[in-house]
């Protein structure tokens, strides 16, 4: 590679910033943090487990389609009914509500995690012209089910044939090439341009009825307007208006065709809901021009800027169920030029089904002949430029649609995680039962309490996933090795027998004498590598040596099976080892002062369903006005052995990041704001910064290995926050940065939780009382009407302790109670609110019952 492509954080080739050494940056192949495809969990659960997502090291979360589904509220969501109905308090989707999704996006953004959703633009649901009452009910919101001059309206005929016209799995296919123009989210009932409104409800639904509230689904003409040129169509001076986030009622309805409706929905998801990326469902079944228009819809539409003020590009990636590069590559478009912002470009990739099919076929069982020769040449990444550099393809080994390679899934997962480029890990939370669809996922995707092979692989990817790909063993014997040059060596085996295989790897990218530490934990796992009377077959540390001027290293490949100490064959499937440069050690991790209490995690769950629901990470509660962050590193002796002293790993710098990057040391800025650097978003320690290896290098005076920073908690929002301290290995060889990350999750609880009455209205012979958590911290709310004057707080809390007056949770920030026989007129309402820390607050408010 000759330069750095600044595409987006997800797809860019990042620069290794050698913070301590002060050397120039080098452009190298990069493995961005992985995408977690998380299905079958509610937004509430995903938000609750944001701490685990952060600790595991995911950079992106991909959720299912958020729309109202056609077949009911238990649907996964691919059968779309209404694209602008993401769930409401009185009728959530399977996953929750629009407010819940918005809040989840904000929480993930605070953790420096991007949120992706499935974007369905090929089809709607199963209802059609033949569905009784559907036409009279208005059909689908925003799309004409039939028209006087076109019986199929905005859709293709049920008899149409071909990938881009037929009904996929019976789902009605949108005809994006048609140009029927309407106001598709109607506001004014007198506007003749409106799409036809439904007249008679069917299945409790009535579509396309004009509603002033629909203004919020439109951009505000003239607000935040940009003018762009589209090189795909040749159109110039195209006005693109922004949604008015401060006053959504200023949205301006406009006429549009079906493609325009889909474009508006994409823009709305990005700007209003807080989505950062779109996984485009069934992209093989839409015509190519549609993808270009989606590129236009999201181009420069992310209002969340990077720390240096530059544009953060929306990332899209297509599902194209095909192994042919000639079919896949046209879906890859990476031509955004930030130096020419008026020219529309795309930041689009595609899921790598070509590699998936090779992994599934060759790692379904052990000892498949030619496995590695097939796999290493299968990636779509090779098809665009002949290099394994992450320039094309989003890799995966399983998804909601397709099964994993059952025999050697760990080997397959290690391969994709340690390669350059973007990759997906799939997790099924099982919150809604053990349904056949979506398919099962990795049960250990969020096993952060004690760690798992998967989470350790993710850590290795994040800390050592920089450096160009170089093949080190060719795989003809069932063994395959590649190096992330000067960073880590990956050893993979698909052999069917037990034991290990010794090999010497030559021309490795490490200096003679360099120690390499096994990073996956397999070498230390007593099941994989049992103690055999004081020795183990697989070493935890190997040393690079020189032979004839060539750097070499002796390694042992771990086979997927082991002979136990009592002579049994044990197939564990963990034919994976990763040896990487050692990095700084801090046995106590991030130390915090002024911790008032701990919200403990719930330990390692026994199954996928529990893993989907239960937070494992401990959260430290801060109630003081400030707290100190401290890291204490120690001289690195691998395996606590003086013979394995690695002074380079002592480290020459540590930096602090709070949330996604904010000023915590009081100098008025984020110290490192260059996108793509390993220091992006981090701050210098101001109270004390004393790395073991000082600015003078190895031969100069040494520091104490201590770093301290006082953080002003009064400047932090109430609720959860995320701390990362990153400590870098000392390098003078120009190699890519490697580091250790030390993390803590905190909860700021300086102020009492606040709530207020949102509404009180007639319902079911009484009134419904809605109370909103105005600061978003409430876990439970109780309400009492007209308590006697002078009722003490102790007496109120006694009522609460008996479970009295508890409101039902109906939305992320909304609680409801039905009050029967409440006389009309004024009443004094006593509201008691608790947040997850146990902190409570008693408030009084006068309301008027209807």
Model-predicted segments: where are they?
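Substrate-binding/active-site clefts of carbohydrate-active enzymes
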Residues: 29-48, 55-273, 289, 293-307, ...
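Flexible, low-complexity linkers/stalks enriched in Thr/Pro that connect modular domains
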Residues: 712, 739-753, 845-850
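Aromatic sugar-binding surface patches on proteins
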Residues: 682-710, 803-817
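Proline-enriched interdomain boundary motifs that mark the N-terminal boundary
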Residues: 587-601, 612-614, 751-758
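Active-site-proximal helices and loops of the catalytic beta/alpha 8
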Residues: 30-32, 48-54, 73-81, 105-117, ...
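Short, solvent-exposed loop/turn segments at the edges of extracellular beta-sandwich modules
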Residues: 728-736, 834-839
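Surface-exposed, short loops/turns at beta-strand junctions within beta-sandwich domains
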Residues: 713-720, 819-826
């Amino acid at each position: 590679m000759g330069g750095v492509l600044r595409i987006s954080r997800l797809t860019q080739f990042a620069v290794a910033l050698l913070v301590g050494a002060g050397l120039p940056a080098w452009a190298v192949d990069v493995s961005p943090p992985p995408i977690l495809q998380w299905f079958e969990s509610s937004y509430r659960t995903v938000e609750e487990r944001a701490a685990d997502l952060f600790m595991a090291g995911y950079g992106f979360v991909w959720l299912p389609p958020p729309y109202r589904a056609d077949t009911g509220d238990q649907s996964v969501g691919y059968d779309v009914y209404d694209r602008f109905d993401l769930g409401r308090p009185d009728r959530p989707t399977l996953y929750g509500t629009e407010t819940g999704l918005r809040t989840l996006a904000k929480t993930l953004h605070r953790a420096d995690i991007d949120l992706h959703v499935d974007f369905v633009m090929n089809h709607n649901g199963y209802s059609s012209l033949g569905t009784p009452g559907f036409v009279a009910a208005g059909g689908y919101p925003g799309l004409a089910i039939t028209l006087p001059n076109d019986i199929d309206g905005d859709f293709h005929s049920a008899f149409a044939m071909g990938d881009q016209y037929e009904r996929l799995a019976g789902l009605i296919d949108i005809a994006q090439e048609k140009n029927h123009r309407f106001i598709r989210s109607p506001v004014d009932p007198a506007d003749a341009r409106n799409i036809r409104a439904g007249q008679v409800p069917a299945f409790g639904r009535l579509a396309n009825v004009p509603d002033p509230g629909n203004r919020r689904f439109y951009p505000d003409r003239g607000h935040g307007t940009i003018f762009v040129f589209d090189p795909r169509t040749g159109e110039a001076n195209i006005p693109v208006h922004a949604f008015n986030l401060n006053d959504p009622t200023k949205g301006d309805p406009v006429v549009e065709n079906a493609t325009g409706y889909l474009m508006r929905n994409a823009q709305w998801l990005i700007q209003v809901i807080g989505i950062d990326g779109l996984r485009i469902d069934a992209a093989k079944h839409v015509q190519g021009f549609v993808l270009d228009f989606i590129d236009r819809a999201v181009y420069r539409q992310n209002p969340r800027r990077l720390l240096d003020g530059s544009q953060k590009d929306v990332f899209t990636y297509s599902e194209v169920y095909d192994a042919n590069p000639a079919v896949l590559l046209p879906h890859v478009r990476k031509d955004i030029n930030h130096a020419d912002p008026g020219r529309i470009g795309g930041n689009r990739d595609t899921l790598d089904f070509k590699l998936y099919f090779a992994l599934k076929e060759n790692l379904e069982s052990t000892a498949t002949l030619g496995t590695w020769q097939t796999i290493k040449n299968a990636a779509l990444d090779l098809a665009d430029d002949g290099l394994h550099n992450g320039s094309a393809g989003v890799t995966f080994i399983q998804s909601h649609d397709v099964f994993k390679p059952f025999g050697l899934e760990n080997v397959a997962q290690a391969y994709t995680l340690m390669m350059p480029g973007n990759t997906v890990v799939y997790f099924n939370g099982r919150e809604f039962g053990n349904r056949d669809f979506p398919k099962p996922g990795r049960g250990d995707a969020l096993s952060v309490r004690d760690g798992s092979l998967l989470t350790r692989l993710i850590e290795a990817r994040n800390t050592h996933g920089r450096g160009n790909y170089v093949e080190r063993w060719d795989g003809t014997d069932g063994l395959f090795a590649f190096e992330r040059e000067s960073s880590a060596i990956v050893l993979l085996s698909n052999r069917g027998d037990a034991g290990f295989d010794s090999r010497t790897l030559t021309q490795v990218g490490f200096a003679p004498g360099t120690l390499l530490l096994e990073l996956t934990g397999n070498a230390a796992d007593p099941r994989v590598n049992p103690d055999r009377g004081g020795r183990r077959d697989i070493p935890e540390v190997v040393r690079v040596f020189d032979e004839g001027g060539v750097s070499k290293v002796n390694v042992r490949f771990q086979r997927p099976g082991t002979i136990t100490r009592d002579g049994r064959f044990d197939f564990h499937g963990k034919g994976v080892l990763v040896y990487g440069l050692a990095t700084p050690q801090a046995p106590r991790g991030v130390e915090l002062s002024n911790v008032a209490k701990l919200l403990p995690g719930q330990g390692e769950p026994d199954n996928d369903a529990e893993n989907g629901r239960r937070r494992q990470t401990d959260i430290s509660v801060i109630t003081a006005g400030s707290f100190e962050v401290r890291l204490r590193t120690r001289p690195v002796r691998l395996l606590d052995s003086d013979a394995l002293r690695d002074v380079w790993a002592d480290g020459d710098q540590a930096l602090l990041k709070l949330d996604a990057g904010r000023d915590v040391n009081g100098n008025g800025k984020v110290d490192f704001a260059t996108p793509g650097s390993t220091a992006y978003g981090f701050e210098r320690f101001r109270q004390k910064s004393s790395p073991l290896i000082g600015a003078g290098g190895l031969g100069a005076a040494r520091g104490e290995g201590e770093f301290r920073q006082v953080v002003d908690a009064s400047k932090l929002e109430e609720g959860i926050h995320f701390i990362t301290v990153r400590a870098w290995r000392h390098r003078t060889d120009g190699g890519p940065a490697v580091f250790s990350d030390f993390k803590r999750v905190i909860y700021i609880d300086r102020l009492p939780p606040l709530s207020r009455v949102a509404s009180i209205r007639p319902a079911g012979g009484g009134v419904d009382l809605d109370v909103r958590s105005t600061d978003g911290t409430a876990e439970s709310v109780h309400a009492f009407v007209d308590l006697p004057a002078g009722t003490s707080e102790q007496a109120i809390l006694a009522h609460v302790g008996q479970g009295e007056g508890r409101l039902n949770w109906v939305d992320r920030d909304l609680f409801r109670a039905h009050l029967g026989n409440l006389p009309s007129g004024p009443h004094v309402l006593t509201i008691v609110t608790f947040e997850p820390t146990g902190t409570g607050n008693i408030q009084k408010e006068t309301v008027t019952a209807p």
